[in-house]
């Protein structure tokens, strides 16, 4: 019997209910592609993330309703900045570091691409409407 690769996905945090959650489409897509999705709670501790990543075959950085903290890329928060969830930022950065150390593939979607960009030293436009001319 062939073993499905285990793909870790960081959860979203719902402040109103205090629950971790994950949109069903992420886990369904990973399963349909032959993988086994594993939800990763936002415990932003290096030892925890490293112990989880030891069991993974890949990482999927999912979308989120929040923005990456601009202080991570050397900018001050703009008035158009959305909510920042520091636990998600730090969890993503730790996941990227641990995945890179183990040579694991990473699929980044929406907010996940922003996290990957910042992890690699990039910056972001916080509010396109007011910061981009034309």
Model-derived segments and spans:
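N-terminal beta1-alpha1 cap of cysteine-dependent amidohydrolase-like domains
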Residues: 1-107, 118-125, 129-134
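Conserved G/P- and acidic residue-centered "switch" motifs that form tight phosphate/ATP-binding loops
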Residues: 110
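The feature captures the ABC ATPase H-loop/switch
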Residues: 113
């Amino acid at each position: 019997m062939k073993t499905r690769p285990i793909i870790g996905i960081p959860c979203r945090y719902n402040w109103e209910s205090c629950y971790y959650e994950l949109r069903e489409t992420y886990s369904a897509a990973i399963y349909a592609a032959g993988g086994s999705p594993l939800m990763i709670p936002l415990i932003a501790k290096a030892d925890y993330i490293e112990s989880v990543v030891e069991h993974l075959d890949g990482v999927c950085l999912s979308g989120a309703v929040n923005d990456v903290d601009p202080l991570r890329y050397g900018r001050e928060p703009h008035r158009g900045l959305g909510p920042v969830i520091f636990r998600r930022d730090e969890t993503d950065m730790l996941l990227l570091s641990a995945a890179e150390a183990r040579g694991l593939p990473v699929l980044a979607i929406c907010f996940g691409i922003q996290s990957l960009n910042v992890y690699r030293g990039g910056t972001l436009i916080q509010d396109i409407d007011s910061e981009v001319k034309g």
